[in-house]
A protein has these predicted regions:
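Transmembrane alpha-helices and their membrane-interface boundaries in multi-pass membrane transporters
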Residues: 90, 94-117
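Juxtamembrane inter-helical linkers in multi-pass membrane proteins
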Residues: 8-34, 113-137
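Membrane-embedded alpha-helical segments of transport systems
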Residues: 35-40, 59-74, 91-100, 220-226, ...
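Conserved small/polar residues in nucleotide/adenosyl-binding loops
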Residues: 306-313
């Protein structure tokens, strides 16, 4: 679409609508790019001449559901909302867009009241993208994703596994632990201690320490949320035949209550949509906005935005 010249015309067509929410026509392209990844989308705001419109576009971009959140949605929607999968999936995307629009209007009203920059944009001619250029873009995007998967995500997954596996009780070297002992070992692991320390902050939302720990790992990359849940719910080799979706919906052997219910799952997905952006996004916000205060603002605003009552209390 970029090579064909359509994206520039899309920005021109959307200018009137974008102005109604306090943005610029050129803000449309970075927001659309945010559905792929927020980091290049934030960097794409460099084309916006207006300082205020550029800042608003940068700050609302993390509310756009990037592709890294899709595995989380697929896992929970497929497990708890199979009959309404399309409705819930689309609803999450629309909710993120609505939050972004409301945030943009609030920022335009209270922080950035003046924007007199006219819309000036060169419209390139329509042209048919060549196969060579298309495959080059595909290769570059695939290479970036594989580097991310094989680099940050792989290393982080190994670290998460190590922190959840150690320290080991002496009995584990002599025999296979019982389900109760496995739960106790995970609870006393390094990762368990970290998760339990943070759990009181999100416990009203219905999240236990395993869920909280997956959210903490998601600050490095949202792809890590599902892999962390997979590590924490892999209690023994005998469980390898049981899928993660089955494990999270089964009753907890200690409490007798499932860690995830439909309401907790919905709350979790909305929380993932709104909470702390990945570290790469925060760095991109600070770099493109020109100050770390905007990176800190993004973290605080996104974390404080989710104030719904606990699903277990409804």
């Amino acid at each position: 679409m970029e090579d064909s010249g359509y994206m520039a015309r899309a920005a021109f067509i959307m200018d009137k609508i974008m102005h109604k929410i306090g943005l610029h026509g050129k803000s449309f392209i970075p927001l659309v790019m945010g559905f792929g990844c927020n980091v290049p989308a934030i960097m794409a705001t460099r084309t916006i001449e207006s300082r205020s419109s550029r800042l608003i576009t940068i700050l609302i971009n993390p509310f756009i559901s990037c592709s890294a959140r899709i595995p989380i949605y697929i896992l929970l929607v497929g497990t708890f909302f199979p009959q309404y999968a399309s409705l819930v999936f689309i609803g999450l995307y629309l909710f993120g867009i609505i939050v972004a629009v409301i945030t943009a209007k609030l920022m335009r009203r209270f922080f950035f009241k003046v924007d007199e920059t006219p819309f000036v944009m060169e419209l390139p001619p329509y042209r048919m993208p060549t196969a060579k250029a298309t495959f080059r873009h595909m290769w570059n995007k695939a290479e970036q994703y594989l580097r991310k998967m094989g680099g940050v995500i792989l290393v982080a997954s190994v670290i998460v596994w190590f922190l959840s596996y150690y320290p080991r009780p002496k009995a584990s070297y002599e025999r296979e632990l019982t389900p109760h002992e496995q739960m106790e070992q995970q609870s006393n692991s390094y990762l368990g201690k970290i998760g339990q320390a943070v759990t009181p902050l999100v416990e009203p939302l219905g999240f236990n320490w395993k869920v909280t720990t997956s959210l903490l790992s998601g600050t490095a990359a949202k792809e890590l949320v599902v892999s962390t849940l997979g590590v924490l719910y892999s209690e023994s080799d005998a469980d390898e035949t049981i899928s993660l979706s089955q494990k999270i919906s089964q009753p907890n052997p200690v409490t007798g209550i499932p860690d995830f219910t439909p309401l907790v799952a919905l709350s979790f997905m909305v929380f993932v949509l709104l909470y702390f952006p990945c570290i790469a996004s925060v760095i991109a916000v600070a770099k493109e906005a020109g100050s770390w205060k905007w990176g800190a603002f993004t973290v605080l605003y996104n974390c404080l935005l989710y104030t719904s009552p606990s699903p277990r209390d409804t």
